[in-house]
Swiss-Prot record:
Interacts with GDF5. May interact with INHBA, BMP2, BMP4, BMP5, BMP6, and BMP7. InterPro entries: CHRDL1/2, CHRDL_1/2_C, VWF_dom. The gene is Chrdl2. One of its GO terms (cellular component) is extracellular region. Keywords: Chondrogenesis, Developmental protein, Differentiation, Glycoprotein, Osteogenesis, Phosphoprotein, Repeat, Secreted, Signal. This is Chordin-like protein 2. The modification Phosphoserine is found at residue 182. Residues 207-216 have a biased composition (Low complexity). It comes from Mus musculus (Mouse). Residues 31-96, 109-175, 246-311 form the VWFC domain.
Amino acid sequence: MVPGVRIIPSLLGLVMFWLPLDSQARSRSGKVCLFGEKIYTPGQSWHPYLEPQGTIYCVRCTCSENGHVNCYRLRCPPLHCSQPVMEPQQCCPRCVDPHVPSGLRVPLKSCQLNETTYQHGEIFSAQELFPARLSNQCVLCSCIEGHTYCGLMTCPEPSCPTTLPLPDSCCQTCKDRTTESSTEENLTQLQHGERHSQDPCSERRGPSTPAPTSLSSPLGFIPRHFQSVGMGSTTIKIILKEKHKKACTHNGKTYSHGEVWHPTVLSFGPMPCILCTCIDGYQDCHRVTCPTQYPCSQPKKVAGKCCKICPEDEAEDDHSEVISTRCPKVPGQFHVYTLASPSPDSLHRFVLEHEASDQVEMYIWKLVKGIYHLVQIKRVRKQDFQKEAQNFRLLTGTHEGYWTVFLAQTPELKVTASPDKVTKTL
């Protein structure tokens, strides 16, 4: 137990007893919710503020469609570390990887939507984003690294008069003992668990089982399909990355600005060698360029893939052109760092650290028409990089084979006269 984290059970029980009664008595059915002299719209979620305790971060309230406020207590998952840490404005403590430099332990960013703050990894509903949705559809959002990702869910029709909100979903389910007993546990697991761990390789499931990651590429770009765990509901396929940019529609599917996909032609099916990008409502499609070199001697052609892959990568095929990563393997393991704060110059910087080298490599990418281009590579001594360590955070782990294949898909780089820098002109 972390000092200062203990909550008096009787006090929390009193809070939980008071919240539903007071909130429902003050709600305006079908319109908005009134709680603590503040007005909330359906789908909004918040931590209640009570005197004299202040904000109760271990309690979460949500305004429902019928104007009622549902409040529930969050439960913290068990931790497998000797010295968990407690961060401000959080309910649960978390483990910190002891191998991460202290300067890189930057708190994950929260999200702001409709004057409500959501923590990294938190799931919530925001119905007003899709006013033209069907009656059996709802809007589910997720906060990831300070960015809000939302999409439509099609919900099954409950076959009972009394319903409750599903955990990790915006759909409703029938009220029964199973749902009641698992609601708090499942919700807490998604909101405050380690699914979005700051170091994806810090978890260990077993001596021979690779630890999962929350990222789908060596650089940690957000995966296109946001998987939900709603019971019987449809997987979200619409992601809103930039609310001020126009989305694209192709073959009955909607893609947000900057999103990339393989088009489907009715006569031929999916086109794995064609890649389309949504650029502010315009579809920009081009042919995929396969790498000329592979980290293996005999790459194989696999059905559904445009480019050949190495046999060792077949088990990790996730039906995507982006190569998925697992935890670093020895030898040839790398750590990937990124800037803790967004860069104002539209450049994205990633630092690759090899444990066996006294240098790190800084890769600078530029976003051009929705596509990332590698524009510069710098080699910096580790001791010099440590001076800027507080500006970076650990993103993920990868190994040499995947990184080689990833870079092989970028435009050709020309080495300049300086041995410490590689540049390319767009």
